[in-house]
């Protein structure tokens, strides 16, 4: 079984728990996920199986989309509803305009300090382990990007919003930081991921639904092939001879098939090597060869 299945993760389970249950339901040994979700969060968790696991590293930069609810007036140690209230503040004098102004200030590229309750490692130790012992350490701010931040509903102290963001963005930290900026504190009370790169809720199934579909022998209807999942990479169709060479570790030549093959800006760009819709490999465009200007390709990952 090779490809991806999108699980609608329930609250209360870790992403690792989901992988263990999917393996058990499908009898699949080789499985992994892309894009960890906090235990209290729900929604899109892409699970890769078999050869699909080879595609995971190429999905790291995928844009994520979430629906979230934040509550003003209380900041917690975990920055969400599972934590202990550390600080309370008065939100009653806040205007709708002030809230909208703060939301607008976070759109674009910015720095974010990862929360103590996270899997980010410092000195080889996950921060959450230090946090559970009552330790707080300095963390380096990380570059993130908020592509869009839309208020869906505002009934203070509750604000429901939709955010589209880059990898590595902690939505609960975003809520916490906006609460600090508003001067009253805030925490996240609900978080649901609606999209992760090419995966969205329209293709998601619950664990119970997956078990039922497995009993019906229809799991293949859920599978997203690696070639579809990596559709954001340009495609190069290979001949039979080129396929044989790829499986021997020899990459094909571009021969004009790489977009703007004479442009140096394409150096390092990744492409899919396919035949008849089947993904054979992911390759990287190299520099042009001297004399003929033809670009070279370097194999990164070969799929069986």
Swiss-Prot record:
Keywords: Isomerase, tRNA processing. Gene3D superfamilies: Pseudouridine synthase. One of its GO terms (biological process) is mRNA pseudouridine synthesis. Its EC number is 5.4.99.25. InterPro entries: PsdUridine_synth_cat_dom_sf, PsdUridine_synth_N, tRNA_psdUridine_synth_TruB, TruB_C. It comes from the Bacteria. One of its GO terms (molecular function) is RNA binding. It catalyses: uridine(55) in tRNA = pseudouridine(55) in tRNA. Belongs to the pseudouridine synthase TruB family. Type 1 subfamily. Responsible for synthesis of pseudouridine from uracil-55 in the psi GC loop of transfer RNAs. This is tRNA pseudouridine synthase B.
């Amino acid at each position: 079984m090779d490809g991806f299945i999108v699980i609608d993760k329930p609250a209360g389970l870790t992403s690792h728990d989901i992988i263990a249950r999917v393996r058990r339901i499908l009898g699949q040994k080789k499985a992994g996920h892309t894009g960890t979700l906090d235990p209290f969060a729900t929604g899109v968790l892409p699970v890769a199986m078999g050869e699909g696991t080879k595609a995971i590293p190429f999905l790291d930069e995928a844009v994520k989309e979430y629906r979230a609810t934040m509550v003003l007036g209380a900041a917690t140690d975990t920055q969400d509803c599972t934590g202990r209230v550390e600080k309370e503040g008065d939100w009653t004098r806040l205007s709708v305009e002030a809230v909208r102004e703060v939301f607008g200030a976070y759109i674009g590229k910015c720095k974010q300090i990862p929360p103590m309750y996270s899997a980010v490692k410092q000195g080889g130790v996950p921060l959450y382990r230090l946090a559970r012992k009552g330790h707080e350490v300095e963390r380096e701010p990380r570059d993130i990007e908020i592509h869009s931040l839309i208020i869906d509903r505002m009934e203070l102290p509750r604000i429901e919003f939709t955010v589209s963001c880059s990898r590595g963005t902690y939505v609960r930290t975003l809520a916490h930081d906006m609460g600090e900026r508003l001067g009253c504190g805030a925490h996240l009370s609900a978080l649901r991921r609606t999209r992760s790169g090419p995966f969205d809720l329209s293709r998601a199934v619950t664990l119970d639904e997956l078990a039922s579909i497995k009993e019906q022998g229809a799991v293949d209807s859920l599978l997203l092939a690696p070639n579809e999942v990596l559709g954001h990479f340009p495609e190069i169709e290979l001949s039979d001879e080129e396929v044989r060479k790829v499986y021997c570790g020899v990459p094909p030549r571009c021969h004009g098939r790489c977009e703007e093959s004479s442009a140096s800006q394409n150096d390092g760009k990744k492409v899919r090597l396919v035949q008849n819709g089947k993904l054979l490999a992911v390759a990287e465009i190299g520099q042009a060869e001297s004399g003929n200007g033809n670009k070279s390709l370097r194999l990164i990952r070969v799929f069986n």
